[in-house]
Amino acid sequence: MPPTAPPEKMMFQLTLRRRGISDQAVLRTMEEVPREEFVLPADRAEAYRDSAMAIACGQTISQPFVVAYMTEQLKLQKNHRVLEIGTGSGYQAAILSRLCANVLTVERFRTLADKARERLEKLNCFNVEVMLGDGYALPPGAGQFDRIIVTAAMDQIPQSLLDRLEPDGILIAPVGPQHGVQTLVRVTRTGDHFDRKELVDVRFVPAIPGIAREL
């Protein structure tokens, strides 16, 4: 980090390291992507606080540590194709875009999808495609993915989503009740077998099937 970095950004990086984030590529990317571009204007001064924040459509931008942790758990490589379910502000997609080949991110709210697309284009994240759609029902032509990240809580991970994983692919998702504590789960595909590992407790907004009729 440059010695002239604002104190809040220096504390931001220190917090991530203290909480166990060690992947240098992830840390560098978290430093480079300006979180203030993804929060509401009234929250820009608090953009580097390690907490989730409200955005439009009753959704949230995730806590920076959780973004970094989930990204680290994906074990991304530069040639990977990544699917994100739940674009939200676009912040997670911006982080992913710097660590893989391309990202397809799916959002059910048109307002969020349009704003995220604008932000990502502004930051030259041209390897990200923002799709207005239903993360539970991807079109057949969407194809397979090396990594899948879900940023809203599911009661269970649908097999149709697991089947989108390439061999040796990894999926990470919060699983549990819609209103309460969920468990972050990492699933690794080996052939037709799926190994599941529970990681940490988290709180996410619920994943809802379908495309929002309003907003």
From Swiss-Prot:
Recorded hits in InterPro entries, A to Z, give: PCMT (IPR000682), SAM-dependent_MTases_sf (IPR029063)
- Principal localisation: cytoplasm
In terms of CDD domains, this protein maps to: AdoMet_MTases
Q: Which UniProt keywords apply?
A: Cytoplasm, Methyltransferase, S-adenosyl-L-methionine, Transferase
EC code(s) of this entry: 2.1.1.77
UniProt cross-references to Pfam families, sorted A to Z: PCMT (PF01135)
Superkingdom assignment: Bacteria
For this UniProt entry, which segments traverse the membrane? none
Does the keyword field hold Glycoprotein? Answer: no
> Which compartments is it annotated to reside in?
Cytoplasm
Show the active-site residues.
S62
Question: What GO cellular component entries does it have?
Answer: cytoplasm
What reaction does this enzyme carry out catalytically?
[protein]-L-isoaspartate + S-adenosyl-L-methionine = [protein]-L-isoaspartate alpha-methyl ester + S-adenosyl-L-homocysteine
Q: Does the keyword Cytoplasm apply?
A: yes
GO MF term (any one): protein-L-isoaspartate (D-aspartate) O-methyltransferase activity
Set out the biological process GO terms recorded for this chain's protein. Answer: methylation; protein modification process; protein repair
Query: What is the similarity comment for this entry?
Result: Belongs to the methyltransferase superfamily. L-isoaspartyl/D-aspartyl protein methyltransferase family.
Q: Which HAMAP family match?
A: PIMT
What PANTHER family does this protein's entry cite?
PROTEIN-L-ISOASPARTATE O-METHYLTRANSFERASE (PTHR11579), PROTEIN-L-ISOASPARTATE(D-ASPARTATE) O-METHYLTRANSFERASE (PTHR11579:SF0)
What is this protein's function per UniProt?
Catalyzes the methyl esterification of L-isoaspartyl residues in peptides and proteins that result from spontaneous decomposition of normal L-aspartyl and L-asparaginyl residues. It plays a role in the repair and/or degradation of damaged proteins.
* Protein name stated in the entry: Protein-L-isoaspartate O-methyltransferase
Q: Which organism is it from?
A: Bradyrhizobium sp. (strain BTAi1 / ATCC BAA-1182)
Question: Encoded by which gene?
Answer: pcm
